């Protein structure tokens, strides 16, 4: 069975944000506005998305 994935797009700038939020975006493979990353649907990835929810948009959510 195929592993579930999430597509996440960066919609906010990390400029003037806490260093931990900038590092979280890097961990999500996002480094420029409007970039899209396809990530595995795991609790750790969902936690990272929740931490920077104001900077990213989930494009399709399988769950």
UniProtKB/Swiss-Prot annotation:
It comes from the Bacteria. The keyword Ribonucleoprotein applies. Keywords: Ribonucleoprotein, Ribosomal protein. One of its GO terms (biological process) is translation. One of its GO terms (cellular component) is cytosolic large ribosomal subunit. The keyword ATP-binding does not apply. GO terms for molecular function: structural constituent of ribosome. InterPro entries: Ribo_uL30_ferredoxin-like_sf, Ribosomal_uL30_bac-type, Ribosomal_uL30_ferredoxin-like. SUPFAM superfamilies: Ribosomal protein L30p/L7e. Part of the 50S ribosomal subunit. Belongs to the universal ribosomal protein uL30 family. This is Large ribosomal subunit protein uL30. It comes from Methylobacterium nodulans (strain LMG 21967 / CNCM I-2342 / ORS 2060).
């Amino acid at each position: 069975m195929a592993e579930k994935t999430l597509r996440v797009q960066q919609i906010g700038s990390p400029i003037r944000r806490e260093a931990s939020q900038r590092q979280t975006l890097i961990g999500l493979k996002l480094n420029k506005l409007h970039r899209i990353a396809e990530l595995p649907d795991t609790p750790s990835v969902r936690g990272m998305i929740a931490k920077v929810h104001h900077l990213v948009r989930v494009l399709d959510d399988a769950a």
